[in-house]
Amino acid sequence: MNAKKIQLIAIYLLLAMGVRAQQFTLSGKVSDQDGNAIELATVSCLEQGAMTMANLKGEYSLKLQSKDSVVIRFSMVGYQTKTRVLRRPRGDQKMLVQLAPMEALKEVVVTERRRQTTGTEQLDVKNIRQTPSTTGNAVEELVQQQAGVSTHNELSSQYNVRGGSFDENSVYINNVEVYRPLLIRSGQQEGLSVINSDMVEKIGFSSGGFEAKYGDKMSSALDIHYRRPTRFEGNAQASLLGGGIYVGYASKQKVTTYDQQSVAKFTMSHGLRYKTSRYLLGSLETKGEYDPNFLDYQTYITYQPNERWSLDIIGNISENHYNFQPTDRETSFGTMQNVKTFKVYFDGQERDIFRTLFGTARLTRHFGKNSKVSLLYSAFHTKEQETYDIQGQYWLDDAQTQEQLGVGTYMEHARNYLTANVHSLKLMANHKAGRHDWEAGVTVKWEKIEEKSREYEMRDSSGYSIPHQADRLDMIYSLASENDMRSTRIEGYLQDTYRMETGGEKPWHLTLNYGLRMANWSYNKETIVSPRISLAAIPSWNEDMTFRLAAGLYYQAPFYKELRDTTTRNGQTVVTLNQKIKSQRSIHIVGAFDYRFRMMERPFRFTAEAYYKLMDNLVPYNVQNMKVVYYGENMAKGYAAGLDLKLYGEFVPGTDSWITLSIMSTRQTINGVSVPMPTDQRWGVNLHFTDYFPGTERWKMTLRLAYADGLPFGAPHRGLEYQQFRAPAYKRADIGMSFLAVGKPDATPSLRHPRVWLGIDGLNIFGISNVNSYYWVTDVTNHQYAVPNYLTGRQINGKVIVEF
């Protein structure tokens, strides 16, 4: 037995030595064309399933099995992928590789597959034009499909993030914060957003735990960067819901920057968009003459005379008109055993105008490739008018017994006017020093807002005015506001991104971002301090994994709407501005896990994020359709906790698809009573799926599905404590089919060789009646009935897109 054991051990050792002899070690360095190290570059051998990442010096080491030929792949976001073949490698092999920048490619497509080492996720803008759309705001609709984000109105481009309101989301274009109109109360009134998707190069989105450079909002940050054209380019599109044209130009004169990039000395982009939702609004239950017209023009101009100086200018003009003359409406609602019908005949009309001007200018001085200082000026002006006089005679009946449950007349009146001007001056600096990436900024904002509003609603039920008083005649709702606000806001931040790695043969790659933000507002004489920190770790034992942790103290600095406090006497509500209001406050803790893997020989990524937000100094609010009405006082505290899951990848080769699942609980305590927040969506599922017809890339399909829990609601003009009901779940499916009629899918379009897409979109293809809000009918006994206001039905939209 001992001899046999010795023989077995000897055979095993010989086999092990043979296997070891077939292995080899590949090491070297990955750099750019100037010899600078490319940190975290990926070095892989796909056929052996082996992969590693270069360290912060660009150095790498990888153990592989020796074969007749071994294919090695070097890749990094922003650089061309390079492949090398080794013939019968043995022992230790050295390989130095230089990667060329992507600018040398004919067409650059930036995808979402790069490693996420901060709280900001890079979203893919590829094929955004082929996605079915109801609002014409493709970027916001892309954000609405992300994990933790929800919307319950396909007519609006606004969104809620992890239980926050519409006003808790900051939006930046080229480092300048942008604003939205203040009087918008419904999705029908919304026009085109300030973001022109044809001009977008990069989209960064954070649903929590974002960096100090992003402003004082509690929910999310959307960071948009516009593209500098590299040649003459453009597109034109038309559909039943509107159209637009975009043209970009780059001069032939080039400038070599400090980082050895060749850029055009002068570029300009122009975009003109038109939107009309008349066709879409025709599917609503309220019939009438809809006349919405939304027009938007935008330009982006850059000038860089030399490597030291550059100038960027953005200009935007938006003119939105919404005119509506309702005629009648008939709604059936209730259960199968208890069906009710609500019928209304209307008189009157609504006429709204939202006119917006926005512009920025940025002058940048470059001090080498690692340092620059920028001075930015921006101006925002909006003039808004909302006027309507609408009278309706209504009947509420039991559909089975024909019993009349309510009959009456109501009159709604509004004369709302608002003018707002915001000017800002910002000085920001960027400096890279070794493994540190510093950024700092100081902003001064001058704000001026004037409002004059008068609203009332009168109801008469069975000959009695509601609410019925024996000694006086009261309106069910009456509001008056005449206010003027002038203020100065000073903001500043300092942050650093530090990249490091642990020691050892297989180090951990760490990215630490930390910063401090401060702000002072002259109106309430408040100073806020917001520290923020995040850490991302790529473990040595699996470089396809990333662990992320973020924490910070976040504030929601009040703007005009949060200041509007109300007092009611004898049925008349008067709006005053609360000068003692404080910023809402939230402590964020976010833990995340990313895992990149291959399935069906295609790349995928799974992301899980758990979060908890502890909030105080809250200003409670009601949501009436799309209008957020605040209490005007810091009188609540609350929390939001949840889990967001996302699976992203190529379910079909060469396409991007994803599915998200969000679970959330958010509550607030008002006057000792715990109630769900108005945006308490307990769960939500989103699917974005892209496919090609078998055997061809000319036919393309995009499917969008949304299934989300309903939101809490209650009778209007009452406190949140009485929101004891929950709306039905929001369910919607949109599908878009596109056919490339002219041109080649893989060729860059031009004036001589354009690409022409023909498309058809099925909007709400299952014809699901989603509830937008409720109209409350009150009889003389003060019994109330909630009549649902349904959103759009099934519609077909045709479109043509020409790219050149």
What are these regions (language model features)?
Residues G49-E59:
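Short, acidic Ser/Thr/Gly-rich low-complexity loop/linker segments typical of extracellular
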Residues S374-S378, K580-N634, Y639, L758-L763, ...:
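Membrane-embedded beta-barrel scaffold of Gram-negative outer-membrane proteins
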Residues Q80, R87, Q93, R115-N169, ...:
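Periplasmic N-terminal accessory/gating domains of Gram-negative outer-membrane beta-barrel systems
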Residues M500-T502, K506, Y611-L614, Y631-G714:
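Gram-negative outer-membrane beta-barrel transporters
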Residues Q304-N320, Q349-N524, T607-A610, W658:
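Face-selective signature of the C-terminal outer-membrane beta-barrel domain
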Residues Y707-P716, F739-F804:
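C-terminal beta-signal and adjacent terminal beta-strands/loops
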Residues L241-T276, T286-Q325, R351-A379:
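Transmembrane beta-barrel wall of Gram-negative outer-membrane proteins
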Residues S31-D34, A41-L46, R73-Q80, P89-P132, ...:
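Short, acidic, small-residue-rich periplasmic hinge/interaction motif at the N-terminus
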